[in-house]
Amino acid sequence: MNQSISSLIKLKFLQSHSNDKNGNKKGGSNVSTGIDKLRESESYRSPFLQLAEIQEHTNNDDDKLDVKECEPTKKHSKLSRIRRKMGRLDLNFRSANEKGSEDDEILVAQHLRNGQDPEEMPFKSENNIDSIEKVPKPDGERVTLTSSGSDNVKRNSKHAPFIPVKPALEKFPSSNRLSRDYRKSQEPTLFNGDRLVPTLPTVSRISTSSSVGSSTAASRYFNPSKRAVVASSSSSSSSIKFNSLHAIPLDATPQIELAKQQDEISKRRFGRRRSRTVDVFDYINKNNTAKNKPPLSPSSFIRTIDEKNTNSLMQDPMGSRGPLLPDDANIISNDTDGAEASHPDHQVLSRSRSQSTSFVQGKGGKRKSIEDEGYHNKLGLPHGSGPTSVYNNKSNANSTITGMSRRSSSIVNALSSFVNLRSSSLSSSRQQHLQQQQQLQQKLDVSLEDLPPVPAPEFSDSCKDFLIKLAPYGKFIGIILTEKDDEFKKNCLNYLLTNCFEFKNDPLDIALRKLLMFLELPKETQQIDRLIMAFSFAYYKAQKSYSKKKGIECPWSNADQVYFIAFSLLMLHTDYFNPNNKSKMTKHDFVDLVHNDKYSGGNEIPMAVLTYFYENVTAKESPKFNYFLMSPMALDDSILDKDAFDTNFAITLSSNSMYSPIDMIKRGSIIPKEASLSPIFYPLTNSISASGIAPSTAASCPPSTSGTINGANLGTANSNSNRPASNSISSYFSYNPSSSSSGNATLVQDDINVYSHIINDTLNEVNLFPEVSKYWNKNALKANLLRNEEHKYEKYYSIMNDTKGGYLRFHKSQLNKLNLPNFEILNDNSRSGCKNSDYKYCKILQMGAIMNLGMPSRKFSIVNSAKIHWKKEFAILTSLGLLICDKMDWINPQMMKDPKSGTTNYIIDFKSGFSFVPGSTIDVYNGLFADRERDSLGKSHFASLVLAYTEHHSTGSHTSNTTAASSSAKHNEGVFEPSSDEEDSITNSTDGTSSVSNGESDNDSVSSSDNQLSSNDSNEDYHSIKDEYPIFEDENADCLLYLHTCHRNFIWKCANKYERDNWIDSINLFSAYDGCYVEIGSIANTICNKRKLTILQRMERLRSIKSAKWEKLKKFESTLMLMGKCVPISTKTKTDMINRIRQLAVRMDWLIYEIKRSELFVSIIKEVTRKQAEKNILEHGKGEEEGQGNNDDSDGIDDIEESFLFNENSLQVCVSDSSYDEYSNE
């Protein structure tokens, strides 16, 4: 294929040559035949044939130039020849010496004056004819063809069609390898030591952030050491012309132009390719001042530059290499036959961010590594700062300015100037500071291979004995014990994690950080798996023991579940902080991935806890801690770094204690007290400030003053400035200056330093247990709501069963104003024509005036802001539910006799238009439950009512909450807001019966108002239990009643304790039998709540509700304890966790409400049934049926009189026949 193309190009060349010859004949041009033959020679045509081949691919029209442009005119034939001569490519080399070139120029000028053609001058005998190496020898020697003659080679215009019309301009500065010094040193014998003319401008090889795929075209395709081509040029001219439109630089060559054309074709084919963003640390001009520095560490402790280069041979196929760092594998020398020449002398530059390899330009044009020049001990920039290239800048200072001025209009020039500016700014003290820190880290960076051989366990060794032998190895014990799948080492690892680590109070993410803080993470996957498995077993064992001690359910199912979550967190950390990973795992992806795993138990972990895990793991990268400060190697202060510890390692072998992080933390020092051989050590708390310590960037000095910790006297400070503070928490961190993988790698001011709290054993000060205690009353389950003293359940049960009593009468037109639940009519006798067919009756169980706690209004003055607003209201408990009205001026009871039952009853007419009627509807409250203590069923139920007064009492201001009587307050009173899934499980049943009888409902009679979070109270701070509600200190607690309803909650203040107990007993008795088929004595057309269950079914349903809610509560309690252990690093995470704790506490409060309510109702039904059974036995023994009826009637009258606020003197006895006839059935 290549030969065919080459033949076609030669044919085109001959045709064009023939056309030029014919054109010259027409113009009357007389050119000698010998000169034409010379112009057709192969040594001259080869470069242009290659250019023609490239140009044919790019533009087929480029090789069809107008021949007329090259036709010489008779008038200016000599100048035309000179112009055509200058339009040909210059190969950058002068004649034998500079003086000879100047003589040639003078000679050419004299010939022009005399009218003689300078091309007819005799050729010189020197070997200066152009030559090109075509095929390299197999043995690596270079073959160069030179012919004698003058450097003013005769050229013909017949070759003009092969001159490229649109040469590719160079976008990057040329390589220093093409400089004068470079080529002179490359082939010193070829030019016999003669001085060369300046060629390509030498520019400093400072890379830019350009996204062009390759470096310089010249450095990629041209190898001056492989060929030598000689031509003439003028030293005073900056450029020569191909034609009148295009200018080619003076130092251009056909090979360079060929490389440019190929590079341009590549760019057109592939387009612009993005390279990675250039970091400031990637390109820094460093002076070669480190040649004479002594090595900082032995060569056996650090990898050589050659090893780093070997590891960096993995290259990005998409060209992620820096723009100005060429890939020498792509530096190819192309000739007309397509031959390629490799360059083994050039090393590949690494773009790894973790390894810094520096290069210098050595003699002979070869780029040698620093190791060859005595730089193998030189430390590069810190990890993550990118590779640093060092070049010989002695001959580049002036050439850089020249090269940049020629490309002043290029965007590359601007970017190069910007990088130069930034690079120069980094030569400040901060850069030196980072280098010093890196040098210190290199000295303190120890691997397991640097330590003496690990002793093998003996047959008689126990786990403790072997761990004592491994104590000097410090944090590498985990790697040693997980190296092989050995049963004895596995038991030793379990023993170490169980007895030397304390995980019972730590969340899983903090426990994992603590593990990796004291034990090095192995590099092998199997070793990591063994370590995480042993950690999961120890963590689950500690958590289960702690939960059993607290009497709660363990939040973890088994050790496999802990292993799954721990390994997920480890993978998340690796994924998030990997600088090469551009697509980080999002919070939603992590939570969804773990929570959907049913096989490993990930679905049992609450999503709120998984969200906390993600935010905490990604908040801070886990650092690598220093071996010398986290192991017994810190015993001897003479051990400064790894250069000296080999001779002192035997000191620690006599230690009789294990490597125990518990002892290190409790003693406040990493040095075990019984193994301390030196009195000079420093506590961990010396360098810890109250605001938290961020990783130190410099070697901190030991404390200057002595002190005590835990009663132990401390020695004087170490005066050695080469060693950091022995136990300074700042020196524990491995400094990473880049941390570009995460935007929140640096701690915010409000965030906590979790490692400081681990070292000082103060994690309990930053966990969320204090927040849990604000919202959760752990003693709520122990409360006994059934009073042991005398109660009046039997009394109100008799009132409900007896016909005689009080009734509230409604006209049928007024029933639509009552917000009534499902009801039924007892003794229905509403036939048309009857006088009482238009009225309905509700039986009254209890009524009276109460003081209701209202919400504070804006009308209050600042002086009265601390006073509680008690509003006087009137309450009526009926067979339908509870009615509350503002005033009682409409109450006018009348005594009427029922002709069917023969009883005299009190009738109160419900009259519309009075003050208690709000307008449209009247709420009838159901699902009632009364209590004498505010927090016996949880802290969230009445918080909305009390917090408003607590805020006013503490600040003297007033909120804009509506009053308690407002119907809209029921939607805005709650302080807590459940989540969306919680609202589905909490239903607002209209009565106690429907909550337990309706199979479709969740059987939760809860208030909708207490399930919503008011935006104004979302950030309220709760006080301690003692000072939580100081406004009730002046109130009599025996007169306060706390009422739960399905609509809202109330706080009542009764006149005395007796009245309060009556209200509590009547409300709870009514709710216990609500919806049951119990005998209700009533007159005709009495309405009550619809009855669905028998008493036995009602009790069975209440027991099942209690059991189901109890199981759910135990799970919520374990989840709440899991949230309480959380240690959020960021402030945002802490705020979110507090809100989730508060929402969970609300759900738990309502579970307690259902449990205790069901328990109390079952107890009431049992108690009343027992009393009724005893009464029936006594009545059956007496056998006095008539006396029983009279006694019952009299008892009923007494009960009714006791239950009303008014007595018979205030009643109007209606004995007229008209009233009697109206009340009668017929």
From Swiss-Prot:
One of its GO terms (molecular function) is guanyl-nucleotide exchange factor activity. Residues 956-969, 994-1017 have a biased composition (Low complexity). SMART domains: PH, Sec7. PROSITE patterns: SEC7 (PS50190). The modification Phosphoserine is found at S369. Residues 405-620 form the SEC7 domain. It is found in: Cytoplasm. Residues 349-360, 386-405 have a biased composition (Polar residues). SUPFAM superfamilies: Sec7 domain (SSF48425). The keyword NAD does not apply. Present with 279 molecules/cell in log phase SD medium. This is Arf guanine nucleotide exchange factor SYT1.
